Amino acid sequence: MQQLTEIVEQALVIIDQASDLKALDDIRVDYLGKKGKITDMMKMMGSLSPEEKPAFGQAVNDAKQAIQQKLTERIDGLKSSELEAKLIAEKIDVTLPGRTQENGGLHPVTRTIERIETFFGELGFSVKQGPEIEDDFHNFDALNISEHHPARADHDTFYFNPKLMLRTQTSGVQIRTMETEKPPLRIISPGRVYRNDYDQTHTPMFHQVEGLLVDEHVNFAELKGILHDFLRNFFEEDLQVRFRPSYFPFTEPSAEVDVMGKNGKWLEVLGCGMVHPNVLRSVGIDPEKYSGFAFGMGVERLTMLRYGVNDLRAFFENDLRFLKQFK
């Protein structure tokens, strides 16, 4: 009995000294497990007389309960302490000011595309999209761009192979639309385009919006009127606008469109012209019956002019100090 009493006293002291749940579990195994000290004491009953066994068995059972109760109390105490420490660590000071969530804003390029889509949408133009990886027919051939035209050169175009490339303009969307839909057509095609160029006013990827109208009896005067109205609407000013004769393989006649800047100088903003008969023929449209006009504009350039941005690369650098100005 003396040995049993010593085991219990020793266990209670060790339990009080345990600092974590792992240590308590080790103590439980050491004293109450299958090979524990209390279990070993139970095995001694085989050597006792029948008269001694009841008292010894009761003593062992009391010892086991005492150790188990002490373990339970200590486990509950440690869990309570851990919870209290966790609550203190995670305590929220409700007197502190709240953290407001900043509202995001549209990127200036996105804003410009939306303004363009809204204006032309009110004139009955629908928005069309197309693949950014284009074949040479839709990117060049159908647009009346000859095999030896400089635009096809490796230093201007990103080629995957001689017949497949990153599109250099969204005009391919116009070709695909004319292949699948019959006139009358009024579409604009905004999207990313790619050219091998990088400096203060050029990036390898930029955004373009091109427009196309095909119908009977379409003329250049209609084109001029629409673009005049668009530019005055976009810049929200009664701008001076001029059309300069130019050359594009896919339009004839062709023109560059300029606006008068605040410094008194003309600034080029877009290109346009009447759709070349060869372009209409390439998609199975009779140029004797139908005519059309097309125009194209660089979104970043328009955005730079509207907001007074000097370096096009700022649109792609994700500098919040810059982007927050357009919220």
Swiss-Prot record:
Keyword Protein biosynthesis: yes
CDD domains: PheRS_alpha_core
Primary enzyme class: ligase
InterPro entries: aa-tRNA-synth_II (IPR006195), aa-tRNA-synth_II/BPL/LPL (IPR045864), Phe-tRNA-synth_IIc_asu (IPR004529), Phe-tRNA_ligase_II_N (IPR004188), Phe_tRNA_ligase_alpha1_bac (IPR022911), Phenylalanyl-tRNA_Synthase (IPR002319), tRNA-bd_arm (IPR010978)
Protein keywords: Aminoacyl-tRNA synthetase, ATP-binding, Cytoplasm, Ligase, Magnesium, Metal-binding, Nucleotide-binding, Protein biosynthesis
Compartments (UniProt record): Cytoplasm
UniProt entry tagged with the keyword Metal-binding: yes
Protein family membership: Belongs to the class-II aminoacyl-tRNA synthetase family. Phe-tRNA synthetase alpha subunit type 1 subfamily.
Cited PANTHER family: PHENYLALANINE--TRNA LIGASE, MITOCHONDRIAL (PTHR11538:SF41), PHENYLALANYL-TRNA SYNTHETASE (PTHR11538)
Quaternary state and interactors: Tetramer of two alpha and two beta subunits.
Protein name: Phenylalanine--tRNA ligase alpha subunit
Lineage of origin: Bacteria, Pseudomonadati, Pseudomonadota, Gammaproteobacteria, Alteromonadales
